[in-house]
């Protein structure tokens, strides 16, 4: 039996949620706009616009253009807000500050699709060495050239370089997003 990825994208999770009548989907990292083969515009973005489910995420992955991703969502009618603040700075690494449309309110009246709620991994828990990100992007590009998927290769490199810490903070981020969903 050949090994295959069992990952489910944010858009896939949203599609399952709408079929099951679940109004809020959670993920940790999400896709966006970037130079990843076949994901120049990740399907997560049109899904946020078209699928009637609110998504809670720790934000677009660090190898993507976060500002272009947020701008695309806003320009296509998706409300993008943060849980703790009205901007985001990255996913598992810290980057440039990108303005959002506000902060989440604990009211079901204000939480409705199309909406992305960004609940970032706390900055003090993120990976500080951005050289690891550069190495991960290079590994992902190498995988693309070999006909493999970018994200598993890049994520694996980050995990290897951090002795599993990357996976740990992403798991904690996913759990934190579940807790946010419980308050809605």
List each language-model region with its residue ranges:
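Short, ordered loop/turn segments at secondary-structure junctions
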Residues: 29-32, 58-61, 78, 83-88, ...
């Amino acid at each position: 039996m050949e090994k295959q990825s069992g990952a489910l994208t944010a858009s896939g999770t949203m599609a399952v949620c709408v079929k099951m009548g679940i109004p809020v989907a959670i993920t940790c990292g999400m896709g966006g706009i970037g130079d990843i083969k076949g994901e120049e515009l990740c399907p997560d973005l049109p899904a946020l616009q078209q699928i009637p489910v609110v998504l809670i995420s720790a934000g677009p992955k660090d190898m993507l253009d976060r500002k272009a991703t947020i701008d695309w969502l806003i320009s296509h009618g998706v409300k993008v807000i943060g849980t703790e603040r009205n901007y985001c700075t990255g996913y598992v690494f810290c980057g440039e500050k990108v303005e959002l449309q506000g902060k989440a309110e604990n009211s079901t009246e204000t939480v409705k699709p199309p909406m992305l709620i960004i609940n970032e991994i706390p900055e003090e828990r993120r990976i500080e060495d951005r050289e690891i990100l550069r190495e991960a992007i290079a590994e992902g590009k190498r995988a693309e050239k070999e006909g493999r998927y970018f994200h598993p290769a890049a994520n694996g490199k980050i995990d290897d370089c951090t002795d599993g810490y990357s996976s740990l903070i992403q798991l904690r981020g996913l759990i934190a997003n579940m807790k946010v969903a419980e308050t809605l």
